[in-house]
Amino acid sequence: MSILEKWGKALDSRNEDSMNDCIHDDYKFTLHSAGKVISKSEAIAWGMSGDISRDKVRILFENDKVGVEHAIVTFNDGNTQAVLSFVTFKDGKIYTHETGASNLPK
């Protein structure tokens, strides 16, 4: 199973131990729309919160250095976005994560 497949399974099942195993300790998630960067613990807390519901997930590319994934993501506030994720890997774990998102009509 690929790193992104493991991450997706952990996120979708809200398995904190598995999320922790997938993410590098020096992980950084850049949230361009909010103008901030969140850490591993913040990303796991967000994943565990139930705010993220993913559908139609497709891994577009993945090798041992980078991965690209697309998904339709619905948030608890009712907003739905088409999200393109770019991740880098280090030591077999997700090291950096950036997303680009387009709002979808409700």
Predicted regions and their residues:
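A beta-strand edge to alpha-helix "cap/lid" segment located at domain peripheries
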Residues: 28-30, 34-106
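Hydrophobic residues in alpha-helical segments
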Residues: 10-12, 47
